[in-house]
Amino acid sequence: MQKRELIYEGKGKKMYATDDPNLLVAEFKDDLTAFDAQKRGNEAGKGALNNKISTQLFKLLESKGIVTDLVETISDTEQVVKKCEIIPLEVVVRNIATGSLSKRLGIKEGTVLPFTLVEFYYKNDDLHDPLVTDEHCIIMGLVKSEKDLQTLRHTAREINSILFKFFAERNLKLVDFKVEFGIDKDGNIILADEISPDSCRFWDATTNEKLDKDRFRQDLGSVKVAYEEVLRRILS
């Protein structure tokens, strides 16, 4: 397989075509962004850490029956992934109130939610990724059917159940996380993109120290040191 031209660049990754029409190369970047990219930074080694973390978590999920786009890791910062049509929704799973949920609804940060909350956000930078309802998703054609929304919600909850237990065993609270899904060449909905401290909130279960991108958002110290600690616990 040969890596070819750049076809897309996002905030955290570059996507390249290959000589196989069904495969892409995803390259993780060291760039950091927050607040709709109003705040920008860069920390050497961050991309490699996210690649390692996401690879480990996708392999864990695959072992539990969650189908993902991961094929193999080919370098410190690169993965081969299945080409799929990305569904234009960010699926956000929340276990503990913080961030936009606390700001939007006035729920005190750190409040443990009585059940896992799953929200959909429309992936649109111009609109600042607004929260959308099931009906909005159908009206706007973001998914093909109500059944697809049920699949997204069910799979997101399954992912949460697996990861929440996994991280609890490593003294980490999985506060919330964002996942994205795609439709593969056979029409199946599969987990895509990444699961990393860029897309999750992790708090140390003893101290509540934040070990994720909130360190960049809130100027809490080195992102790399925190991501290294998350990886260390994943591998422990």
Curated annotation (Swiss-Prot):
Its EC number is 6.3.2.6. GO terms for biological process: 'de novo' IMP biosynthetic process; cobalamin biosynthetic process. It comes from the Bacteria. One of its GO terms (molecular function) is phosphoribosylaminoimidazolesuccinocarboxamide synthase activity. Keywords: ATP-binding, Ligase, Nucleotide-binding, Purine biosynthesis. Pathway: Purine metabolism; IMP biosynthesis via de novo pathway; 5-amino-1-(5-phospho-D-ribosyl)imidazole-4-carboxamide from 5-amino-1-(5-phospho-D-ribosyl)imidazole-4-carboxylate: step 1/2. It catalyses: 5-amino-1-(5-phospho-D-ribosyl)imidazole-4-carboxylate + L-aspartate + ATP = (2S)-2-[5-amino-1-(5-phospho-beta-D-ribosyl)imidazole-4-carboxamido]succinate + ADP + phosphate + 2 H(+). Pfam families: SAICAR_synt. NCBIfam families: purC. Belongs to the SAICAR synthetase family. PANTHER family: MULTIFUNCTIONAL PROTEIN ADE2 (PTHR43599), SI:DKEY-6E2.2 (PTHR43599:SF3). This is Phosphoribosylaminoimidazole-succinocarboxamide synthase. It comes from Campylobacter concisus (strain 13826).
